[in-house]
Amino acid sequence: MAKDYPRSRRIAEQLRRELAEVIRDDVDDPRVGSVTISEVQVSRDLAHATVYVTVLGAEAAEAQAGIDILNKAHGFLRSQVARRIRAKRTPSLRFLHDTAFDRGARLSALIDEVAPPPADDEPSKE
């Protein structure tokens, strides 16, 4: 497992904040949809950043289309972020779909199937 360095954590958090603002304010493509950046992982040499995103309220194909658009716009996004952060170098960006939310929703649905929540109209035990 790779070591986690405080500088790379700081840069990752700063990238996450700035990318969220840039995508919200400067990306006008409606195919991107409502994007949430859940995590940014930066390489030790700070040359590459993997950005995990979720597209809210979108089917898998629509979400992937939005992520593909972000990957095509990575140069624009990188230049906009470079203007906002103080770093010698801005990492190259790669956007990936974060499946953690989808897995959590699927597990929650499976749990509800096995043990459905109690009905409200059952008499309480007193």
UniProtKB/Swiss-Prot annotation:
Biological process per Gene Ontology, one example term: maturation of SSU-rRNA
An example of a Pfam family matching this protein is RBFA
Keywords associated with the record:
Cytoplasm, Ribosome biogenesis
GO cellular component labels: cytosol
Q: Does the keyword Cytoplasm apply?
A: yes
- Ranges annotated as spanning the membrane: none
- MF-aspect GO terms: ribosomal small subunit binding
Compartments in which it is found = Cytoplasm
Gene3D superfamilies the UniProt entry points to = 3.30.300.20
Q: Which InterPro entries match?
A: KH_dom-like_a/b, RbfA, RbfA_dom_sf
Q: What does this protein do?
A: One of several proteins that assist in the late maturation steps of the functional core of the 30S ribosomal subunit. Associates with free 30S ribosomal subunits (but not with 30S subunits that are part of 70S ribosomes or polysomes). Required for efficient processing of 16S rRNA. May interact with the 5'-terminal helix region of 16S rRNA.
Give the family, as the similarity comment puts it. Belongs to the RbfA family.
Query: NCBIfam families given for it?
Result: rbfA (TIGR00082)
Q: What is the annotated quaternary arrangement, including any partners?
A: Monomer. Binds 30S ribosomal subunits, but not 50S ribosomal subunits or 70S ribosomes.
State what protein this is by name: Ribosome-binding factor A
Which species is this record about? Halorhodospira halophila (strain DSM 244 / SL1)
Query: Which gene carries the instructions for this protein?
Result: rbfA
